[in-house]
């Protein structure tokens, strides 16, 4: 069953096409990877999905329903949650309060929200930090809190943006385990990730984009061997080295 469908997504900023003709489908229970060099349009696609930016053209469907132009909070209530590459929790509030605030997307009373928040905190391994202020957490735990907040909305589709960025190897392994366990519990996932070890380990299929356009879709093995993908990443590396 197809959970999510993006049809010919286009987004212009002035005369610049940040996303141009991107189409893909995600099946129920799938972890779908989205890769590309820096500035290729990956996060812009997430911003289009939850209507942080309006589409220039194209359409987006959750199951059989178009969500194009829908308010962001309504998209969340329908079942799409996301994390952000630069995490910004409610810094002066506790972990529990942060997650409780997210839980109100799904329930109506403080008692229900706190119950859902604690269940989600325990699942994500943050129970011992529930009374800590978010601003006191190191980056690895703030990244985990970001996932926990999104998960407390009980999404059908979870969008993860650079979850592994800035993590130690141990934290990276823990993040992979958490994402896989979330997926095993029935949540479909689209993940943006720049660390190839992570994306190749957890994704069932991957879409590679460059300059806002799709260049390849396939299994991790197929993507790793694709000449256009290799060229896109080698080109980025050469530019970074000034060659």
Language-model segments: what does each one mean?
Residues 2-243:
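Glycine-rich phosphate-binding loops of nucleotide-dependent enzymes
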């Amino acid at each position: 069953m197809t959970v999510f469908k993006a049809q010919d997504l286009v987004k212009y900023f002035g005369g610049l096409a940040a996303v141009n003709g991107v189409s893909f489908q995600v099946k129920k229970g799938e972890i779908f990877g989205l890769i590309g060099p820096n500035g290729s349009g990956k996060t812009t696609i997430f911003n289009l999905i939850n209507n942080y930016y309006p589409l220039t053209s194209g359409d987006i469907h959750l199951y059989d329903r178009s969500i194009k132009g829908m308010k962001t909070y309504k998209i969340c209530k329908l079942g799409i949650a996301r994390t952000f590459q630069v995490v910004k929790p409610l810094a002066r509030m506790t972990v529990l309060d942060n997650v409780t605030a997210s839980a109100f997307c799904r329930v109506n009373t403080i008692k229900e929200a706190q119950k859902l928040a604690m269940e989600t905190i325990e699942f994500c391994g943050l129970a011992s930090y529930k009374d800590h202020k978010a601003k006191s957490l190191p980056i690895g735990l703030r990244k985990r809190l970001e996932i926990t907040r999104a998960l407390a909305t009980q999404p059908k589709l979870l969008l993860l943006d650079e979850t592994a960025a800035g993590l130690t190897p141990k934290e990276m392994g823990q993040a992979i385990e958490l994402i896989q366990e979330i997926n095993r519990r029935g949540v479909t996932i689209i993940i943006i990730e720049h660390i190839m070890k992570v994306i190749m380990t957890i994704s069932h299929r991957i879409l590679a984009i460059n300059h806002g356009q799709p260049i390849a879709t396939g299994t991790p093995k197929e993507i790793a061997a694709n000449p256009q993908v290799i060229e896109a990443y080698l080109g980025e590396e050469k530019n970074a080295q000034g060659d």
